């Protein structure tokens, strides 16, 4: 999660920082002895009866541990609904011995993972007022059940009221559990239909000493972090009028699917994080319970291994997808560097973040009456004209001498050192801070407890020039205002993790983008801003829930295809989307995948790039998985073909070629989901120096022809190693524009000899 769990409430600053700093999670994990619980992956179930699956787990453990009683004491969880496996307390040597068992796919230690709106859906054009809109067609998502795996939920929030909702869908098989401060009969309703808290992994990892009362936690589904409540309301929050944060961003709050049902699975806890043994159990339960989509705003750092079973979200989501349940997960918040994207398994819908067309300008008035507009969430009263000083090498001495009392401090950059210094400035009684940055990141103001504004270097230099040419420079900081619409440019923020995929570069990640900057949503009884791919993920999850109502038989891959091929490459107003990093540039597929999600287009994509179990098995073969591992994962004997399939032919709604030498031909298959008699022709935007040749030149569909395979010959004119260049391939029938991104890197020299 990194620094992405940003709370725009300075009264919550200490708690917020405790939650977002990686070091806290890591130190807590070390303190609590991370390596006691091991997760034993067995792959697909060999029995349909959960009791028989559980029995098979004991049959594996008993010989290793010497008795049934020892096996019972060791066992933490049985995973028996969506897949087979268990979590058990094992020594390192026991885990090593168990990994050699013929039925065991892999044994991995349980780990700690990190948690990674009044305007969002208006911005995306998902409007409740239009009788032809997706919301009206789906009755606001009333039949959709969205499973959220996170830090719990604050049930009293008005975002979870069930006014106007009909009966709970009959297919629901889940539970609502009571606990400390949470009464299932009182707090669950026709909106919040499921609420569980998974604690066995937590308590075993903490040796039973997780002191939840002193940490302000509850052994219940209740959310004391705020994150789970926030994301659940983004996905499926009810209509709430007059929602705002201290007067900012006022309007009607609602989720993507306002009448959808929520099932919360709490696996994340204060000062510890999210325990993977519990997270896998939550995925297992969500498969059992009958959710339509699983939303996971949790992750780690960018992966460095091909192994699906080393990725708990990747492993659990594989089995969910095999059951037809889409899994939507966050790309992570450790951007903007390349190859930082998380949750990269090709069956996961991985979500990047963008900004909204909304900003919060802060008037900064200098003593010469020049007013400069900064940015930030400043809800403090106006700071009248007061002395303006520069944060430089003399600042520490000024703090010691009390010279910062009541002043506004100008600081160039806002790195970790400056934020620590800002806390010293705050403690020394300064009245406000102005940060000057090369690329504006207003979220840094959430780290200080005084009025704060952010400007770019140009404006920062203007302020500095005024200070250097004035005997007693002064400034005034006004509260933020809310500005919506043009001329605000949409952007992929610095924190959003970028591609290419670190373990399978031919698999484009992220897949899609959604708003994740300064998103207003529910927390404990109020509404607050948070930023991160955590906030973008439930926006997509809610839209996927709506899509599953309109197309209940579409596979998770078909849904991902519809999201990608209909996405905006610009913002909804037609303006370009920029990418923030060390420099600002136009966004490309490694920033936002297929683009910004377009909810009103996604139900009618025209063509889809579909995949099923055979496609995923071909991927595993191409990723050098051996037959035995794939057979265990699948639950039956499987042999990869010889030669193994090319990962370049994996039927994704994208073409990514990380090492092109000369030329290569790739294939894709599309299925017609539009009018039966349709003719599509290609529109090609070739990457720089790359030639794309498509065959056949037309795709002619009829009542008996619903699928067509085409090839794309990719040829480079470059004769040196290049970076990635980007283009697109669009099939159009004049109504539907089925567009996929094309990313190509030419590579003549190997990285090793």
Curated annotation (Swiss-Prot):
Domain Inhibitor I9, first and last residues per copy: 38-115
Active-site feature positions: 150, 227, 534
Record's signal peptide: 1-29
Domain Peptidase S8: from-to ranges: 120-603
Keywords, alphabetical: Autocatalytic cleavage, Glycoprotein, Hydrolase, Protease, Secreted, Serine protease, Signal, Zymogen
Top-level taxonomic group: Eukaryota
GO MF term set: serine-type endopeptidase activity
GO cellular component entries: extracellular region
Any single biological process term in GO: proteolysis
Cellular location(s): Secreted
Top enzyme class: hydrolase
Record-listed E.C. numbers: 3.4.21.-
Positions of the propeptide removed during maturation: 30-116
Protein family (similarity comment): Belongs to the peptidase S8 family.
Protein name: Subtilisin-like protease SBT3.17
Species for this entry: Arabidopsis thaliana (Mouse-ear cress)
């Amino acid at each position: 999660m990194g620094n992405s769990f940003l709370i725009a409430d300075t009264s919550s600053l200490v708690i917020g920082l405790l939650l977002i700093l990686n070091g806290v999670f890591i130190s807590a994990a070390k303190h609590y002895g991370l390596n006691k619980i091991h997760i034993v992956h067995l792959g697909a179930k060999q029995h349909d009866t959960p009791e028989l699956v559980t029995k098979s787990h004991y049959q594996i453990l008993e010989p290793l541990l010497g008795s049934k009683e020892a096996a019972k004491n060791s066992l933490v969880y049985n995973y028996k609904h969506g897949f087979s496996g268990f979590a058990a307390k094992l020594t390192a040597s026991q885990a090593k011995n168990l990994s050699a068992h013929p039925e065991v796919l892999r044994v991995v230690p349980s780990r700690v993972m990190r948690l990674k709106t009044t305007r969002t859906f208006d911005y995306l054009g998902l409007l409740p007022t239009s009788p032809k809109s997706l919301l009206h067609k789906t009755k606001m998502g009333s039949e959709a059940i969205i499973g959220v795996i996170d830090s719990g939920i604050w049930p009293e929030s008005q975002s979870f009221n069930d006014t106007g909702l009909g009966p709970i869908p009959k297919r629901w098989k889940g539970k609502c559990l009571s606990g400390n401060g949470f009464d299932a009969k009182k707090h669950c309703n026709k909106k919040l239909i499921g609420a569980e808290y998974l604690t066995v992994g937590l308590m075993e990892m903490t040796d039973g000493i997780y002191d939840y009362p002193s940490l302000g936690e509850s052994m219940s589904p209740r959310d004391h972090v705020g994150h789970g409540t926030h994301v659940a309301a983004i996905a499926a929050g009810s209509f709430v009028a007059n929602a705002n944060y201290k007067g900012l961003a006022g309007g009607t709050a609602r989720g993507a699917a306002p009448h959808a049902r929520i099932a919360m699975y709490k696996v994340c806890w204060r000062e510890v994080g999210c325990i993977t043994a519990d997270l896998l159990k939550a995925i297992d339960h969500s498969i059992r319970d009958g959710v339509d989509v699983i939303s996971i705003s949790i992750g780690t750092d960018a992966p460095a291994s091909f192994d699906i079973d080393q990725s708990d979200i990747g492993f659990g989501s594989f089995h969910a997808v095999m059951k037809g349940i889409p899994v939507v997960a966050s790309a992570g918040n450790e951007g903007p560097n390349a190859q930082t994207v998380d949750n990269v398994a090709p069956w996961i819908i991985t979500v990047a973040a963008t900004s909204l067309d909304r900003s919060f300008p802060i008037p900064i008035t200098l003593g010469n009456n020049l007013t400069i507009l900064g940015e930030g969430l400043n809800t403090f009263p106006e700071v009248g004209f007061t002395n303006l000083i520069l944060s430089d090498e003399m600042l520490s001495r000024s703090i010691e001498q009390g010279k910062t009392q009541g002043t506004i401090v100008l600081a160039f950059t806002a790195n970790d050192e400056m934020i620590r210094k800002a806390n010293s400035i705050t403690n020394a009684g300064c009245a406000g801070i102005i940060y000057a940055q090369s690329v504006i990141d207003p979220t840094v103001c959430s780290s200080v407890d005084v009025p704060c504004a952010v400007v770019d270097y140009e404006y920062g230099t203007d302020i500095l020039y005024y200070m250097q040419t004035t005997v007693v420079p002064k400034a005034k900081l006004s509260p933020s205002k809310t500005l919506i619409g043009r001329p605000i440019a949409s952007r992929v923020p610095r924190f959003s993790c970028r591609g290419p995929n670190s373990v399978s570069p031919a698999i484009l990640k992220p897949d899609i983008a959604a708003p994740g900057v300064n998103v207003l949503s529910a927390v404990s009884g109020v509404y607050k801003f948070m930023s991160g791919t955590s906030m973008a993920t439930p926006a997509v999850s809610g839209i996927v829930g709506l899509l599953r109502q309109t197309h209940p038989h579409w596979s998770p891959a078909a849904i991902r295809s519809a999201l990608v091929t209909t996405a905006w490459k610009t913002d909804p107003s037609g303006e370009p989307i920029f990418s923030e990093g060390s420099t600002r540039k136009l966004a490309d597929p490694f920033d936002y995948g297929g683009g910004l999600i377009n909810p009103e287009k996604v139900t009618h994509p025209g063509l889809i790039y579909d995949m099923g179990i055979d496609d995923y098995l071909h991927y595993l073969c191409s990723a050098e998985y051996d037959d035995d591992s794939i057979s265990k994962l699948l639950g039956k004997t499987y042999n990869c073909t010889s030669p193994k399939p090319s990962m370049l032919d994996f039927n994704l709604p994208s073409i990514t070629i990380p090492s092109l030498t000369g030329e290569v031909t790739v294939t894709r298959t599309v299925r017609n989901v539009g009018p039966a008699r349709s003719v599509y022709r290609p529109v090609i935007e070739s990457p720089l120096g790359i030639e794309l040749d498509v065959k056949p030149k037309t795709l002619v569909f009829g009542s008996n022809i619903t699928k067509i395979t085409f090839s794309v010959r990719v040829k480079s004119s470059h004769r040196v190693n290049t970076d990635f260049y980007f283009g697109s391939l669009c099939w159009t029938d004049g109504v539907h524009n089925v567009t996929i991104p094309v990313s190509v890197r030419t590579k003549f020299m190997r990285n090793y000899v």
